[in-house]
Design a protein with these regions (language model features):
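N-terminal acidic, glycine/proline-rich low-complexity segments
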Residues: 1-230
Length: 230
């Protein structure tokens, strides 16, 4: 999540909060110089003595890699806008349930409870407007059909970093929103006035971020029809 509120803490999305070091290390592989955004190495697991934990324990990446990793992220800014709403689900499932579909009975059994749980956590939506956000399905859809369908928009080469050690900001996606001019020197390291090495053109991550899809209003219905072959 880059703009709106997150689902686990005010700043930490579930996956980046659960293992911020893993996320930060993967994102670092998108950088032309991964060492510029590598997080500090965490201590050995609790109770482990020096030399007991499996070596190498989160060893440093090489200074240079054969190529940069291509990562396209789908933050909650985009995934939370793709929903299956309770009313749409019920209307779509009525004839399928009437046909005796075991799959429809199974999914309805747990999705009805899920809709109820989501409704209990919300203060502004209820009834048929309660929606389930399609985080993982949207990513799968992108991988399956991106090459053959217009409407996707991905911002490329964004320097998005993951906070790994903040007391209140663990798992936060950090971006530089300042209007500072990039440094023109060839120095990759930090310099006075550039704490964090945000201004070097040779430092930082290069992450793709999805900001638009061809199915913001239709994906939920499309997913149901594909799953139940309607």
């Amino acid at each position: 999540m880059l703009i709106s509120c997150d689902q686990i803490t005010p700043e930490g999305e579930f996956n980046t909060f659960a293992d911020p070091v893993a996320a930060a290390r993967v994102y670092a592989l998108t950088s032309p110089n991964p060492f510029t955004t590598m997080p500090p190495t965490p201590p050995a697991p609790p109770g482990a003595k020096e030399g007991e934990h499996p070596p190498p324990y989160l060893a440093s990446y090489p200074q240079k890699l054969s190529r940069q990793l291509k990562v396209t992220m789908f933050p909650l800014d985009i995934t939370e806008r793709h929903l299956i709403k309770r009313g749409e689900y019920r209307k779509t499932m009525e004839p399928v349930l009437a046909s005796g579909s075991p799959l429809a009975e199974w999914t309805t059994a747990f999705l009805n409870a899920t809709f109820d749980k989501v409704e209990s956590l919300q203060s502004k939506v209820s009834g048929d407007e309660v929606g389930l956000q399609l985080h993982d399905p949207l990513c799968v859809w992108y991988c399956m059909i991106k090459a053959g369908e217009a409407g996707w928009k991905v911002n490329v080469d964004e320097d998005i970093r993951i906070e790994t050690s903040g007391q209140w900001t663990r798992g936060m996606c950090v971006v530089d929103r300042r209007s500072r001019r990039k440094r023109e020197d060839d120095d990759v390291g930090e310099r006075a006035g550039d704490s964090g090495n945000w201004l070097s053109s040779k430092a930082g991550n290069r992450v793709g971020r999805c900001v638009a899809t061809p199915g913001e209003r239709s994906f939920g219905g499309y997913l149901l029809k594909r799953v139940f072959q309607l």
